Amino acid sequence: MTTCTVDNAQRTAAKIAGVAGLVAFGLVVFANYVLLDPLIVPRNAADTARNILAHQTQFRVALTCFIAYGIGSVVLLSALYTILAPVNRSLAFTGALFRLVFAILWLIAPLNSLAALRLLGDATYLKVFEPDRLQALARVQLAGSFDDYYVGLPFFGLAATVCAWLWLKSNYIPKGLAIFGVIASAWCVLCAFIFLIFPNFNKIVNDYIFDSPMAIFELIVSIWLLFKGIRTPKSGEADLVAERSRKSVSLRLPAFL
């Protein structure tokens, strides 16, 4: 026998979270690895500048994808708050706040990229600078996007850690998956802070190992939520959830938005 601890708003939010998570994941992978990476030539500002100028539309589409990813992150955090608030409203709010901070920091990257485009433009006031200096400055702007991501990564990791813990307490998803999420997300937070203090840390632990386990967790959860939805915990599994879920949970945005 089961106790109904999941209402229709949570079920709808689960579908929204699944779609938002998958779309956001697809956008960032496509923008990074299909559109942007081919244009960037490591340690060569001049070739990078020429590639960007020759493929401005491709470059701008990548920026648009990054902006859409930020929007998707806000949709995702709102849906996750709706799902997880009955488990622990304060923790769900904290997780949503961490993810919002990450989304805001993420949007600095498109601004840096637009600044790089401006430096490579043909405006009259740029004529006072040598072309190689402008190319170097544009490359610095692009490199700043890397810094933006790693400043935001601890917030992303903390958001994922909080959510994974709430998934574990709620029994809405398989327990093993939730435990993996807690470990992967906490690992990401640890690596992010170590890397910010010791920038050569990525020579010991590859950058991709910082956040890939957490990204895999979020991807699997998104697929689960979209196709499986959230499970109704068995009687006695989550008494706290059962008690709090009697209250109406709406799909409104958290109060801080």
Question: What feature does the model see in each segment?
Answer:
Residues M1-V249, L253-L257:
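Hydrophobic, aromatic-enriched alpha-helical segments typical of multi-pass transmembrane helices
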